[in-house]
Design a protein with these regions (language model features):
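Post-transcriptional modification and biogenesis factors for structured RNAs
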Residues: 1-197
């Protein structure tokens, strides 16, 4: 049974560390973050689709991607240890609890993850501005395969190194007035094409 304690709005701001709490806060255990060794041991239980987040910077985007992924049945997410958003209170809040239904693997080297996945029959798709249209029949063959989908950072996209390791590139084409979408929005559109929740 949880204990409920009433506090002033100033006390709540202080407890949470900001005023973005809608008048309510809950103390919870931080979700467990796994490493590359855990990923290797779990290789047969990662799921049909794994999302690899290539230096996503905004914790709120990270949380929103996890929320979207879990909605579409994704349970495994890979993030780099350095130069990337981590699992903060903001990321947890943005995930709307979805993070507690997922496994996040924090790794030193994404290339090593891709090598491991390739050996274990995963195909890699990387997001790009000028890749293959996700509605293209050319990509239909990927829909029944195990997939590692790489989502690039908000500013730089997928790194050149990781692009070279992809089996194919994928893009979402709009009306050209705007050249890209928020990464969490793009995640939802991509997963609606490739995931079977």
């Amino acid at each position: 049974k949880s204990k409920i304690k009433k506090v002033t709005s100033i006390e709540l701001d202080s407890l949470v560390g900001n005023s973005d709490h809608q008048g309510l806060a809950m103390k919870i255990d931080k979700p467990e973050i796994f490493d590359f060794e855990n990923l290797k041991r779990s290789i047969n239980n990662l799921g049909k689709i794994i999302l690899i987040l290539d230096h996503i910077q905004d914790p709120h985007n990270l949380g929103a991607i996890i929320r979207t992924g879990v909605f579409f049945g994704v349970k495994s997410f890979v993030i780099p240890k350095k130069r990337s958003a981590s699992i903060t209170s903001g990321a947890i809040k943005s995930s709307a609890g979805a993070i507690f239904h997922s496994n996040v693997y924090e790794v030193s080297n994404i290339s090593n993850v891709l090598k491991l996945l390739k050996i274990n029959n995963y195909w890699t798709l990387g997001t790009e501005i000028d890749g293959n249209d996700i509605n293209s029949k050319k990509l239909d063959g990927f829909k029944n395969l195990n997939l590692a989908i790489i989502l690039g950072s908000e500013q730089k996209g997928v790194s050149k190194l990781l692009k070279k390791k992809c089996d194919s590139s994928i893009s979402i084409y709009g009306n050209k007035k705007i050249d890209s979408l928020n990464v969490s929005v793009a995640t939802g559109i991509i997963l609606s094409k490739f995931a079977n929740p």
